[in-house]
Structure formats: C-alpha cells, structure tokens
C-alpha cells in the first residue's frame, strides 16, 4: 500500500466506524450523546492524579527499556531506513502492526482511567481535535523521543490553562504562534534541545575527568555457526523476466543462471536495465512477467524480506545504512533473523559469520564498533554494508556498483574480499560494475545488457574480445541480426 492510501484509510476508517456505532439500534454507546452517570470508582481527584502519574511512569519506564533494548534498535532502524530493513530480511509491516496494537492498548488504558474519572464517555472527547492535539504534543516536545511528547503535553496543558483564564480572547492565537515558531526554528522539538544542553553542561563539568578508551569497551565478536546449508548447485535462475513501466519496456525476456561459487558481472551502458534487473531479482513485486528461482524455490510475488529469507542479500548503488546507529548496532540488526533480538535487554556480544568477521578485520571496522555510522568514510560505509549483507548468510549476493567512489587501494581490497568469499562460503555473486578492469580481475562470467536485452553471456575473454561489446560502448547502432548473433 502507498503512503497516500494508508493516510486516507487511516482518516476515513474511524469516521465510518463511528457512524456505525451511532446508528446501532440498541444504543449501547449512547449514540452521538455518549454515556453519562455509569458506575465508577469512588476515588478523590487527588487519588486519580496519583493513578495517572503512576500509569505514566510505568509505561514510560517500560518504553525506555524497550527502546534501549536490542529490539528497540530495530524500531529506530525502521524509522530511519525501512527499505534497508526489508532487504535485510526484517518483516517491517508485522513489527509496525504489533507496535500499533500495543500503542492502542496503552491508549485504551488511558481512556478507561479518564472515563472512570469524568464518568462521561462522548465521541468528541477523542475526536479529530484531540488527535490533532496529540500530533502537536509530539511535534512540540520532539518526535523520535520518549520524554518529548510528555514535555509537550505538560507545557501546552499548563500554558493553555493559565492563558485561557488571563487572556481568554487571544490565548489560542498565542499557543498557535508558539507552535509555528517551534516548527520553524526548532524543528526537532524542545526535548532534543534540552538534552543537548544537559550534555553540554556534563561535558563542561567532567572535562578534566579521564576519558574512557573506546577500544576497552568494544562488544565481543564471536564466530557464529554457519546455518545456511541448503544451497543448490544453481542458487539463482531467472526465467523470461520482463519489466514494464507503463508502455515503456525496460527489461525484455531475461534468462540467466548463476551457479554456486561463481562471480557473474553485469555490464552495459547507462540505461541498459542493470539496476532494474537487480530490483526485479530482490523484490518479487517488481517483475511484470517471468519468474525468479532461488535455491530451487519459485519466488513469485513476495516482498524483499521474504526473498531475503530464501537467501538473497543485496547492497545498493548508493550506500544504504543507518546513520544514527553504531557499527555494532547495524551488524546486530543484520542478524535479526538468525538471532531474535531481546525486547528488554541490550546484549553487547556479536555473533557473526566468518565472512563478516574477515571484512571487519580487513578494514579495521572491528576497532570501530562503537562509532556512529555517520562518522565513517565512504569506503568504510561500503565495507560495512557488505559486512551487514553477509551477516544475513545469503546464498545469492547482489552487489550494485560495490566500488563506486572508492580509491584504487579500496577497490583492490574489495576484489580480494569477494574472491575470498567463494573459497569460504557456498554462494554465488551477481554484481553490476562499470570498472572493467575490476570486472576482468574477479569475474567467472560476464553478462552484457543493452536496451533491456541480454546480448551476451560468456567468459571474460569472450566478452572482452567481442566486437559486439565494442560496438555498444562506442555508441554504434546495433542491428537485430547482431543482437541475435
């Protein structure tokens, strides 16, 4: 479903449900007038406030433990880069659905307490206006934080109560102006600003204290047992695959087989359909026609996380990571399917396959596990993405321009890593690359795409010495006879 579709359904569905409740013949809900005077608890106002405070502290503490656990890092990753999560094999829709249900349950507890306090249940209490107020609380306090919505709710409620009594004609204008000012000048909200101030003060107070050596506090790297043992002789087979965008045909009848322990490079001019082919292999909803077989299983119309479960791992043309997470958190995220993350504990040790450990040691990322991803160089980000994909233990590794933007020494290192992978892992590698020297050095076979068609599939020597390939890269017109040659 598109974001627009979800937004419309989210807005319209509650309206329909409310109208159905209004029209029920038994008047169980009191229709549009609501319910009043029903039996409640005999508690004083002060006791109700104590209950409200206790419930707030309980759920806030539980949320803090949850967000700071290993599973909480998954939620942060989904918020930051949902597509990358899906291609790592994480069922983001399932996680968001359960999170939505849990949030609704907490809201139900709050509604139960509020109804018991006021002895009134009416539709307008939790209507569209109240929903808008919740969004304002979140935006003002700081989205992506736990304390932010609490701060926003307290500030707005207290200021509204004070201003409505002293400035009854302009208080809404003042509150609205403050909200607009915060959105314009402090878009992250008040809570992050307060936390930055606290960190600044702490940095000044403890400036003379001995600094902790980050190398002494690194998570322990443990060799994980290799679990992907169901790799077929032909892990990847593409049959008559085509992709249309409206009336434009981008891929036409692509047939391709890749055997185990083989590196196959896809080359071709810009616009040949190379990245589109990658998308069609790694996302079952992309192809218009044809089929993709992974380890003998026909993929069909399935999502990227289901294809990852079958054994497909993919890196992107533009490095796709989680800028706000640490290197260790990213690697732990990649092991989501192999090791279910704890919901209330933050386990530091990392169980990683040998291929991932080799990359970390070769690039010295094993000494930077606590470093934020946003602080890494482009070359290290490329290496980290490859390490994450290998941590999922794929049998088919898809690499889209893995050497883009790298120095010569970094390209040499990547070439060495990829060739070593075939010696230690039963997998096949399909990569897109424009660096023909790199392709020549590591490839078992080369596939040539041109205008969405597979023109040539042969050994390195056959492709390098092909007059057809020279014609393509020189920009000469290719005839139908040459295409079918």
Language model features: what each stretch is:
Residues 1-213:
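Transmembrane alpha-helices and adjacent helix-loop boundaries
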Residues 267-269:
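The feature captures the beta-strand-to-loop junction immediately N-terminal to the Walker
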Residues 282:
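Helix-to-loop junction immediately C-terminal to a conserved catalytic motif
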Residues 290-298, 310:
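Conserved ABC transporter NBD signature motif
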Residues 397-401:
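Catalytic Walker B motif of ABC-type/P-loop ATPase nucleotide-binding domains
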Residues 439-441:
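A short, surface-exposed alpha-helical micro-motif characterized by mixed small hydrophobic
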């Amino acid at each position: 479903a598109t974001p627009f579709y979800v937004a419309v359904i989210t807005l319209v569905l509650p309206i329909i449900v409310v109208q159905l409740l209004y029209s029920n013949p038994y008047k169980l809900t009191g229709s549009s007038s609501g319910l009043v005077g029903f039996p409640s608890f005999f508690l004083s106002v002060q006791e109700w406030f104590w209950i409200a405070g206790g419930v707030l502290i309980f759920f806030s503490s539980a949320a803090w433990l949850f967000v700071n656990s290993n599973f909480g890092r998954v939620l942060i990753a989904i918020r930051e880069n949902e597509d990358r999560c899906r291609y790592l094999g994480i069922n983001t829709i399932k996680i968001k659905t359960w999170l939505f249900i849990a949030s609704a349950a907490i809201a139900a507890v709050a509604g139960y307490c509020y109804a018991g306090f006021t002895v009134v249940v009416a539709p307008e209490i939790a209507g569209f206006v109240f929903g808008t107020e919740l969004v304002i609380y979140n935006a003002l306090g700081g989205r992506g934080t736990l304390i932010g919505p609490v701060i926003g709710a307290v500030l707005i409620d207290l200021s509204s109560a004070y201003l409505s009594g002293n400035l009854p004609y302009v208080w809404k204008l003042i509150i609205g102006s403050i909200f607009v000012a915060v959105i314009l000048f402090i878009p992250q909200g008040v809570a992050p600003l307060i936390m930055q101030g606290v960190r600044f003060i702490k940095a000044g107070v403890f400036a003379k204290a001995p600094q902790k050596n980050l190398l002494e506090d690194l998570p322990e790297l443990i060799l994980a047992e290799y679990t992907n043992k169901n790799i077929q002789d032909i892990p990847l087979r593409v049959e008559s695959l085509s992709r249309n965008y409206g009336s434009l045909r981008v891929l036409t009848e692509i047939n391709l087989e890749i055997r185990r322990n083989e590196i196959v490079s896809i080359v071709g001019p810009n616009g040949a359909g190379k990245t589109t082919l990658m998308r069609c292999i790694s996302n079952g909803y992309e192809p218009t026609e044809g089929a993709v077989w992974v380890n003998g299983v026909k993929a069909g119309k399935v999502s990227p996380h289901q294809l990852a479960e079958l054994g497909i791992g993919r890196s992107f043309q533009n490095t796709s990571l989680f800028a706000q997470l640490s290197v260790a958190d990213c690697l732990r995220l990649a092991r989501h399917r192999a090791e279910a993350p704890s919901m209330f504990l933050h386990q530091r040790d990392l169980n990683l396959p040998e291929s991932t450990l080799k990359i970390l040691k070769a690039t010295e990322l094993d000494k930077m596990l606590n470093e934020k991803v946003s602080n890494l160089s482009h070359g290290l980000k490329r290496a980290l993405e490859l390490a994450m994909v290998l941590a999922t233990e794929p049998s088919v590794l898809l690499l889209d321009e893995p050497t883009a933007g790298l120095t010569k020494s970094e390209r040499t290192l990547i070439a060495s890593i990829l060739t070593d992978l075939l010696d230690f892992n039963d997998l096949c590698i399909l990569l897109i690359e424009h660096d023909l020297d790199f392709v020549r050095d590591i490839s078992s076979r080369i596939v040539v795409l041109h205008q969405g068609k597979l023109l040539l599939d042969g050994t390195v020597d056959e492709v390098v010495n092909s007059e057809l390939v020279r014609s393509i890269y020189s920009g000469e017109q290719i005839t139908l006879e040459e295409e079918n040659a």
